[in-house]
Amino acid sequence: MSEHRADIYYGNLYRREQDSTDVYPDKLTDRVCYGNVPCHQACFYKAELLKKETPFDLSYKIRADYEHFLRCVYRDGARTIHMPFTVSDYEGGGFSEDEINRKRSAYEHRLITKKYLGNKVYRYRLLMILTLQPSRELLAGSRTFSGLYHKLKAFIYRISGR
């Protein structure tokens, strides 16, 4: 049973506003961690990870949870396990979703990914541009297309073994 123990368990997230489910990959690669990790509403941390030092770096006003996840995985070697079912029902409309905070979030994302992924970030930024990331973001946020988009993404994760 010990091979199934993790420091962080994460499941899928139902987005009520879009009426769709974010299906996260089984394996969190550098590329996945650059794009975005499972949101904090879908994560369950071993208590020790939250008791170490200060769990959240509050200099990150929007992305403290993202930085904490990457710190646990990259610096502390936390093991993760994906639970292939929905664990959170997210209503939407959170603090990070208004225009000013979205800009701050993008800025903090650049700082955090550079800190943990180093120069790999340039490759991943280029990949996001080439794969039309802004268009994918619009599809994912659309009530009309979100369900289809997330089903396709889950299928790609499944066939690619991620």
Question: Where do the protein language model's features map onto the residues?
Answer:
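Residue-level signal for alpha-helix termini/capping positions
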Residues: M1-S2, Y74
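Membrane-proximal basic amphipathic "stem/tether" segments
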Residues: K114-R162
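A short, conserved acidic/glycine-rich loop-to-beta-strand motif
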Residues: E3-L13
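Conserved nucleotide-sugar donor-binding catalytic segment
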Residues: G11, R15-E108
